[in-house]
């Protein structure tokens, strides 16, 4: 016989432990359904499309969360060993400096307290303050504070060592992340993790694994395809930039197509970020080699001039101020000011778009992307922070919706195994003997075409790389990813025995 429990007249103390759980689960389902029914009646077609799209993504996300990625445990041990050796070298060098100059014999670089004592008491450097987790304005030794102090000649070698050791410590922490019993690392992707529609990721649903969306290039080679499979990493090219161009076109093409299309035309005509590099660094030896090769010259902490210039372009698109952008890009502030004058002179539609966003905030309080994703903004419309957030929102949401539309296409076709989404890229694996067929098909499947105003077609192009591990190929990583140019004649050098899988 079924026991009926009327929760409206329930004496909770009269229930057994099992009955308490039953009531809790029943309320959890019934109340949620009642709320859904009320909310569902209020959803318009714009919101419903976004809701249905998010629901459709649950299946590929669950599959990716469950599958995880195989780890080359031999490679992982080798990378850990190399990073530990680098750590010992930097620690020894740092202690030589501290003992010789400051007669300091014991120092733990990982201790914020000891770092504050060294920098602000022993070295007497200007105290850098910011609000801590408790909201108190207090001395800080975070990266931003240390990079400000590194401009002092006496502090530069000490701070460079501390920053280098912190980077190594963070990398070692990731490399030592426990694996599951099948030798795989997993994450938990969240479809609703951000306001833009981009995914976030964190530890897996059972508490292990980690965020796999911020893994640096130096660590990626430990991720390998399953035996008999090969990786493809497909990356949207200039996604946010082309989104900015599409918005400018839609807003202003009725007034002047040349004005409205100046930025989108530049995006579609070639390598935008190399063009930006030439604008900000005119004194590089342009003409002595291909422009992109010169732009890829290393500039700061493994970052190329092109990567730094890319930050300037994005920062300028998103209302970045010269002083802040100089810190982020490591270009002198005077160069950033000169760059922005040239940049906005070449693409005057961008500052006009910025003004349009402010008008929409003040008069409508919402923005809607060409993909149909709408967001309301509840901050003060005349506040700078709200304006900056709104300016960045639609281009970033367009990139997220474009890659996720492609991911859904790949999953529905059931020809590849999805692994890791990194905001504007997707890593998947496929039977390696099918490469010449799968890669061209996947490039087409990842397209999310739109038709802009005046019937202008718009699609964010995709670059493909293939290989047997997630790192870029090189002398020390022959099985890494290489740009796909119609075929890949390489043969895998590491077997499953060498991978440490058996």
Where do the PLM segments sit?
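Function-dense linear segments that define catalytic or interfacial modules
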Residues: 188-296
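Short hydrophobic/aromatic beta-strand micro-patches
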Residues: 427-431
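Short amphipathic alpha-helices in soluble, non-transmembrane regions
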Residues: 438-446
